[in-house]
């Protein structure tokens, strides 16, 4: 956003403040947690203010997402666990959202199934490519689900707490 339109990313905080298309973005996830490779949301931690800001705009939706489970294998167990829990909660919040639909529910259900069946295995052995792939795909399904159904109180409460304590 700032590469094309300048300024500080804080100027684009909120919904629909990006003035137009950005430079085409190719997203390559290195964790299985945020789902940002398939969403129009970007959450950025401002460490100087102990604050997480959210930019929401369809203009920042990645043009392509390249999924390579090998890239997840170097994450420490603590990061793999935190990201996996985040992805599962993305799916859970989308599933119970009042804005949920049959489509978002299908994405959320598949995400919860993939993550639920693989998170312990992946955290225990990040070199397990099959588990890493399931976590990665589950995270992206969760991202699609919450893009359509939105998130809830868990994420609303977690952003200020996690920014203040500098935890994922």
For each predicted feature, which ranges?
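Glycine/threonine-rich beta-strand-loop-alpha-helix active-site module
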Residues: 1-69
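Active-site catalytic microenvironments for nucleophilic, acid-base chemistry
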Residues: 2-4, 94, 164
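Carboxylate- and glycine-rich phosphate/diphosphate-binding segment that chelates Mg2+/Mn2+
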Residues: 41-149
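Charged, alpha-helix-enriched surfaces in structured cytosolic catalytic cores
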Residues: 152
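Short conserved active-site loop signatures built around small residues
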Residues: 155
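Catalytic phosphate/nucleotide-handling subdomain of diverse soluble enzymes
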Residues: 160-168
